[in-house]
A protein has these predicted regions:
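Inter-Walker segment of RecA-like/P-loop motor cores
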Residues: 23-73
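Conserved acidic residues
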Residues: 62, 87, 112, 132-134
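Short regulatory helix/loop adjacent to the ATP-binding pocket of P-loop NTPases
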Residues: 123-135
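Conserved nucleotide-binding/hydrolysis micro-motifs of P-loop NTPases
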Residues: 8-11, 69-72, 95-96, 120-124, ...
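Conserved Walker A/P-loop ATP-binding site and its immediately adjacent core
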Residues: 1-29, 101
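SF2 helicase catalytic motif II
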Residues: 68-70, 79-116, 121
Length: 167
């Protein structure tokens, strides 16, 4: 299984959540036993030099998390070798998938089950994201359930140079 994210920060956040099983491991929910084995999560933080190196890395992991910039910079044969090691591909921030770099990578995984996540299901350029919507959490429902709080904006940068040393 591979998870592709757009940034290093998300790669770190997602890999930590997967490694710890996130909310699944919260004892108050009783979803899994404390003794359950946790997945071996690999963080692909550099480009493998060959398909063999990529495969060797993938074989040591249950889940690999990487960024689009890393996997997108690999040659097609290495991408396909990685895809052949994956039962599933999870794409975070999937509204980016119509972009050329993302669609090339996604094409390498065409024989893999792909699950895409996005909170931005519409693009300004009207390019379709593709796929079938299997879950939708409307903004109105999120607002009604209190997931949005009032924003108290405090600027970090003062544009008026006479006030730049004051808060």
């Amino acid at each position: 299984t591979m998870i592709i994210v757009p940034t290093d920060a998300l790669r770190t956040q997602i890999s930590n959540k997967v490694a710890s099983l996130g909310l699944l491991s919260n004892s108050q929910f009783g979803l899994i036993k404390e003794t359950v084995l946790k997945p071996i999560v690999g963080v692909m933080s550099h480009r493998p030099c060959s398909a063999e190196e990529a495969i060797a890395f993938m074989e040591q992991c249950n889940v690999v998390v990487t960024t689009i910039s890393i996997i997108g910079s690999l040659s097609k044969p290495i991408q396909v070798a990685i895809a052949n090691q994956c039962s599933h591909l999870f794409v975070d921030e999937a509204h980016h998938t119509p972009a050329r770099s993302w669609s090339i990578v996604k094409d390498s995984f065409k024989n893999t089950k792909i699950l895409q996540f996005t909170a931005t299901p519409f693009r300004n350029d009207d390019k379709p994201i593709g796929g079938k919507i299997i879950f939708n959490y409307p903004l109105r429902k999120a607002q009604d359930e209190g997931y949005f709080k009032p924003i108290n904006y405090i600027p970090i940068i003062e544009w008026n140079s006479k006030q730049s040393d004051q808060i």
